[in-house]
């Protein structure tokens, strides 16, 4: 009879037991002496065993399996103080095994745990939507794993205590890729970077930066390059580090060559260059490191010319009319090609001013602009030469007379089609006039490599008469010689 009563369902009701008395078997409710814990569920031999719910006074609770008084097996736990929840396997009161942890701040973790910490393989999504899948240790990303960041970047490789360290590959959202060594979450050690602009760097990295990165553009050759009028010439360029070593680890930067003519308004400097600009075509002069300003001048690149490149005068003459400054200013590349000058808009045809050959990609720190020459002055740019006799008149003008001195158009070549004595027409000149010019090589890599472009470099150029390295001289007593 007593055995039958033990099987009566009514005997399993919690009302038969006082909350202050620990139940022995079956279902019961028990409030612990410190009143912080309350248990509702199955008992066996005076211990929580089977399915039950343990409630905490702060609002936290666990519901699931118990074994011999301990939270062990499958269950669900809610922490009131953090708002986090866990559903999965437990061992001795701690999440252990496989489970899902959801965070109140956002995100969740699904995978293996040990003593409540992420341990082993798992999948973690944080509150920003960033996703990591791989190995964990001591609650941190550790070992092999891959992560997709909120900006779209993706990393696959080694981790050490939540930081990328070891060997890994980073696929950037902009198309750039880095493959190599990492330390403390940045590029460090041997690696290769393929930038979205087409620039590549293969070599050592230190604290996230290339150790042998190019810092400046250098044009090889004499300080003053002298070229015979109408002759093509070649310009060799190097990208150099701060110590002057060639940046051989770097390739792919896009360099653009452009030209300027010396801008002179004073009569005493007219022999080096003087161009009178129409108001409609006047451009803002650009300061050069040679002590004078220049204005943009057309430059052409071609592969077919009659003269040999050997006509370039290799020896540089000293004693320039204006002293050369030691400092080299940084020129914004936008000054010559405007905003939005990207590779996609480069012309494909050659033998034209500003053609695609005026753009060269660097290969292992070096580039060459082959068969380049200066063309004829553009419309609105008229070359003039002051005569010595006129300089005397200019010096004898009344004080305060600000009117420009008399000038004559130069007779180096016809400016436009003119009639010869035999009735034929002389074609306009296709070569630059004698005088001083400036070549400029600028970095137009787009987008800029690692957010920066190299400063523009300048090369001093002098155009000389064919067969004579001296500029024409007009005696004072024969002003009509050039008329």
From Swiss-Prot:
What is this protein's name?
A: MORN repeat-containing protein 1
Q: Where are the MORN repeats?
A: 39-61, 62-84, 86-108, 109-131, 132-154, 155-177, 178-200
**Which organism is this entry from?**
Rattus norvegicus (Rat)
Q: Does the keyword Repeat apply?
A: yes
Phosphoserine modification, residue list: 18, 403
Keyword set, alphabetical order: Phosphoprotein, Repeat
Compositionally biased region (Polar residues) = 418-427
Give the span(s) annotated as Disordered: 392-427
Q: Which InterPro entries match?
A: MORN
Per its UniProt entry, which superkingdom is the organism in?
Answer: Eukaryota
Claim: Phosphoprotein is one of the keywords in the record: yes
Q: Where is the composition biased (Basic and acidic residues)?
A: 394-404
Matching entries from Pfam families are given as: MORN (PF02493)
